[in-house]
């Protein structure tokens, strides 16, 4: 269980939350542009400090911990792959800072690459990969961190419909197999409906209590009716 009870008041940033999120569930995070969706993920991951309140994961307070200690991984839209490194070296950064990779590390790397479907591409650099392959490589690196909370900040927005659907299905499969809690920011209601049973609406400086995705994205009377009606 991830329990959030916090407020953020810093310069132009305003955001508050009082919600609980169940483990082993995928949540979509939706709302108008500028509502605070990415800020919400940055707060959870530790890149933005809250003004007051708490963030509790499985009865452990984590709001005072650095990002590396929170059991949370985040995947961004730009993938953050180092262009001068091969896929193998990009992924290795998730498990070791040593130049020499141990046999155990090699096994972990191969397992992650197999899980996301890029085994055999380890010697390529990011520029030699398709957009879908880059997304899979970035996902593999995140999975190697072995955290149980996965945050997705529109990582597949630049992909075409077919590739994006493949990545969403892959996320669903991995989340189930690894028993992950997933929060995915998206501007596309169709993506939310495909992957998430529940949706968190971020609106008017508030992270609202999760509700059924179909209810949240009802275009005529849901909480985002005005927003969805203009898209």
Name each region found by the language model:
Residues 61-78, 97, 220:
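ABC ATPase NBD coupling module
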Residues 85-94:
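Short coil-to-helix segment of the ABC ATPase nucleotide-binding domain corresponding to the Q-loop/switch region
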Residues 103-121, 172-173:
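Conserved ABC ATPase "signature" region
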Residues 125-129, 133:
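Conserved ABC ATPase signature
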Residues 144-148:
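A short, proline-enriched helix->beta-strand linker immediately N-terminal to the Walker B motif
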Residues 150-154:
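Catalytic Walker B motif of ABC-type/P-loop ATPase nucleotide-binding domains
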Residues 206-229:
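Conserved beta-strand-loop-alpha-helix hinge in the C-terminal portion
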